[in-house]
């Protein structure tokens, strides 16, 4: 019985961990953004699973009001493309409430991940992982690609 359990666990683990992240059955995951026990925004990520790639479209909206008056706004929209479990491209836009706006673009090129953001063009390790809430793999990384500003953290 012990051996059957180990074999079943091995088969299940190889299926579950063959992707860098699990794709939800309904191809969507959403989070509420909570501050001081109040819902101030949302993050919605939609997964498009193609034959050889996964495209993740994420929208983050935050609106903070004080006495019904807007005090802070934030908006971010990104489209990430993953092929064979590897992060290969990003196209994003971030709008901070203080008029800062960033266009984030990145692609795998010549064994590097070439990206642009608030600091201009960056030549990063091809295996860089984006900073995203749904991807637990980022917790194992020493450096991640910040998709809000297009910088390395």
Segments (PLM) and residue ranges:
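A short glycine-rich beta-turn/N-cap micro-motif
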Residues: 86-87
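Hydrophobic/aromatic beta-strand elements that line small-molecule binding cavities or substrate pockets
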Residues: 43-48, 76-81, 104-106
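Juxtamembrane/interface motifs at transmembrane-helix termini
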Residues: 61-62, 76-77, 108-112
């Amino acid at each position: 019985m012990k051996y059957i359990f180990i074999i079943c666990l091995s088969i299940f683990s190889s299926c579950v961990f063959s992707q860098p992240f699990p794709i939800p059955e309904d191809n969507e995951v959403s989070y509420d953004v909570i501050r001081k026990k109040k819902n101030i925004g949302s993050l919605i990520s939609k997964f498009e699973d193609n034959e050889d790639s996964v495209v993740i479209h994420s929208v983050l909206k935050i609106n903070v009001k004080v006495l019904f008056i807007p005090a802070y706004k934030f908006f971010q929209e990104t489209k990430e493309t993953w092929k064979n479990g590897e992060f290969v491209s990003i196209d994003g836009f971030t709008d901070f409430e203080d008029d800062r706006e960033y266009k984030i673009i990145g692609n795998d090129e010549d064994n590097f991940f070439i990206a642009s953001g608030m600091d201009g063009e960056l030549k990063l390790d091809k295996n860089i992982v984006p900073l995203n809430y749904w991807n637990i793999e980022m917790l194992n990384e020493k450096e991640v690609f910040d998709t809000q500003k297009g910088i390395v953290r």
